């Protein structure tokens, strides 16, 4: 009886709206371009909400990531298990008890957690959700390239002040699914003699980055790689098989994925999903490949959060993950960004190599108080991921040196300070670059990205059984670099060494060894009189357009094989 009275009292406090606070006051709630409101949602309709519970020992987790990722540390390569991570960050008993009582009082019944117990996903009716989260008002929206339907609130939500120490944020209210940034460029005109290639294929990738027909997985090691797909993006096995028939004849490969985690729909294949799978499996050839499919098919789901929760619920995971997802930093609440950054830190502690596309808007641009500034993207700006930029061939039809792909995302975070591992490289760039934009356009003390790059221009992809040319974007360069790292992991595992894990501390210590330095070109930015559409420019060593450069496989293997 005492517990029931306590719960009723807590729920009464919630309903009154007294002593409440907003966990995400800075979350942007303007409707993204391409989305349309369809009006209020039915009060009896059900939706799922994800509650991010406050974790413990995050600072200690950060220290452990540094220890297991730094080659000079005696702990290098001694990664944590999922169970180790869970023991470290699991919310306190008080947090678990308080949140569970609160949800029970609100009528939430269908809830499930993850092994780390720091996420809780519950199904509620719209009526219950609006009572639970005062201020929220759920509407239907449709948008995106596949006419996706979502339920979101255009208004901020409140939580009882008593929950402030226990809940970071509630997912499924504000953030819209990201749209694909892939571009299909016009076919360049061939002039003069016939070129050596008519678009980027696996054979072009392998020739440029010095991969021989023998540089494939053994098929016997405990090695695997993965890509993640969102927003109703699916691949088809038949497309993968046709792609390998067309372009995989000169190297051993696998023609099907080993495992799909999540929901793999039966709709039309998406170009981005097809690209991710086909080039991860041709660069990292003959290596077991997983696909994480988090399409966000239910209207209340946030696909990226779903993927993070899948990582927190699997003990045995692929060693390399490539992700072509990103949002503008300024479009996300600080609570959301900081918590997602902790999730990426958890993955790094477990020895996972996470590669994120740097984006396809150059330095980006937005207006702050009437003045233009560059616009960094997240998670590309996280200090716990390896971010991949994009390049083009200097001569479009010749396998030659690379230059900047002008769309390649890059810049400096407005949220995360510069990590110590890149202090020397970034300081050198800022002090020596002859073409720096005005200092008012970027945060010179922020985490700088990308870290590396690969070709991002003019790919061939098979989608819905149709070969499609001239697909471009860092969504292409990211799986290519990921596949090459998987080949290096293959050698490390077969020689009794741990996989590479979080790569950045080692990458910056080696000052670009094993990479082709890209020194020509600039990327795009604000179209104004001051910068005239030009962002940062590449140069010798690290730069915020192509990072340390593109992979030279034999040299990179030699550099990363030991210890």
Curated annotation (Swiss-Prot):
Residues 199-563 form the Peptidase S53 domain. GO terms for cellular component: Golgi apparatus; lysosome; melanosome; membrane raft; recycling endosome. This is Tripeptidyl-peptidase 1. Lysosomal serine protease with tripeptidyl-peptidase I activity. May act as a non-specific lysosomal peptidase which generates tripeptides from the breakdown products produced by lysosomal proteinases. Requires substrates with an unsubstituted N-terminus. Binds 1 Ca(2+) ion per subunit. GO terms for biological process: bone resorption; central nervous system development; epithelial cell differentiation; lysosomal protein catabolic process; lysosome organization; nervous system development; neuromuscular process controlling balance; peptide catabolic process. Monomer. Interacts with CLN5. Interacts with CLN3. InterPro entries: Peptidase_S8/S53_dom, Peptidase_S8/S53_dom_sf, S53_propep, Sedolisin_dom, Tripeptidyl-peptidase_I. It is found in: Lysosome; Melanosome. Residues 1-19 form the signal peptide. Ca(2+) binds at residues 517-518, 539, 541, 543. It catalyses: Release of an N-terminal tripeptide from a polypeptide, but also has endopeptidase activity. SUPFAM superfamilies: Protease propeptides/inhibitors, Subtilisin-like. Keywords: Autocatalytic cleavage, Calcium, Disulfide bond, Glycoprotein, Hydrolase, Lysosome, Metal-binding, Protease, Serine protease, Signal, Zymogen.
């Amino acid at each position: 009886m005492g517990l029931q009275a306590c719960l009723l009292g807590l729920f009464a406090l919630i309903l009154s709206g007294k002593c409440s606070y907003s966990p995400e006051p800075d979350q942007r709630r303007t409707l993204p371009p391409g989305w349309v409101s369809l009006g209020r949602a039915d009060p009896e309709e059900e939706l799922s909400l994800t509650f991010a519970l406050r974790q413990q020992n995050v600072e200690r987790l950060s220290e452990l990531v540094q220890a297991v990722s730094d080659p000079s540390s005696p702990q290098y390569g001694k990664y944590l298990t999922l169970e180790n991570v869970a023991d470290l960050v699991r919310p306190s008993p008080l947090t678990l008890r308080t949140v569970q009582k609160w949800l029970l009082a609100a009528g939430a019944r269908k809830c499930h957690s993850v092994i780390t117990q720091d996420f809780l996903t519950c199904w509620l009716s719209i009526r219950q959700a609006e009572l639970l989260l005062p201020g929220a008002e759920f509407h239907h929206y449709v948008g995106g390239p596949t006419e996706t339907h979502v339920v979101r609130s255009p208004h901020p939500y409140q939580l009882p002040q008593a929950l402030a120490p226990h809940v970071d944020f509630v997912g499924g209210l504000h953030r819209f699914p990201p749209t694909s940034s892939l571009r299909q460029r016009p076919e360049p005109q061939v002039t003069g003699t016939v070129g050596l290639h008519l678009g980027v294929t696996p054979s072009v990738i392998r020739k440029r980055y010095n991969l021989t027909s023998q540089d494939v997985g053994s098929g016997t090691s405990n090695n695997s790689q993965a890509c993640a797909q969102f927003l109703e993006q699916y691949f088809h096995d038949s497309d993968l098989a046709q792609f390998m028939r067309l372009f995989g004849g000169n190297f051993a490969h696998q023609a099907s994925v080993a495992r799909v985690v999540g929901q793999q729909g039966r709709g039309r294949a998406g170009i981005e999903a097809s690209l991710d799978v086909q080039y991860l499996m041709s660069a990292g050839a003959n290596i077991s490949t997983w696909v994480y499919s988090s399409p966000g098919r239910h209207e209340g789901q946030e696909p990226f959060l779903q993927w993070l929760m899948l990582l927190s619920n699997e003990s045995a995971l692929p060693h390399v993950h490539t992700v072509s997802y990103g949002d503008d930093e300024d479009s996300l609440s600080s609570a959301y960004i900081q918590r997602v950054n902790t999730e990426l830190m958890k993955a790094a502690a477990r020895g996972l190599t996470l590669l994120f596309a740097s984006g396809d808007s150059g330095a980006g641009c937005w207006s702050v108080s009437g003045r233009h500034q560059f616009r960094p993207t997240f998670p590309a700006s996280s200090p716990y991921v390896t971010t991949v930029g994009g390049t083009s061939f200097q001569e479009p039809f010749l396998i030659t040196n690379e230059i900047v792909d002008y769309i390649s995302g890059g810049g400096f975070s407005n949220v995360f300070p510069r990590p110590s591992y890149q202090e020397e490289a970034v300081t050198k760039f800022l002090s020596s670059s002859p073409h720096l934009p005005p200092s008012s356009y970027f945060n010179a003390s922020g985490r700088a990205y990308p870290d590396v790059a690969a070709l991002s221009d003019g790919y061939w992809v098979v989608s819905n059984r149709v070969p499609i040319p001239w697909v471009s974007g860092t969504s292409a360069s990211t799986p290519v670099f990921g596949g090459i790292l998987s080949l290096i992991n293959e050698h490390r595992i077969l020689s009794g060494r741990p996989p590479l894990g979080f790569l950045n501390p080692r990458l910056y210590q080696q000052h670009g060894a094993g990479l082709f330095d890209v020194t020509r070109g600039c990327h795009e930015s604000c179209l104004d009189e001051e910068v005239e559409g030009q962002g940062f420019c590449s140069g010798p060593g690290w730069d915020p357009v192509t990072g340390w450069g593109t992979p030279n496989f034999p040299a990179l293997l030699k550099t990363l094989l030991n210890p």
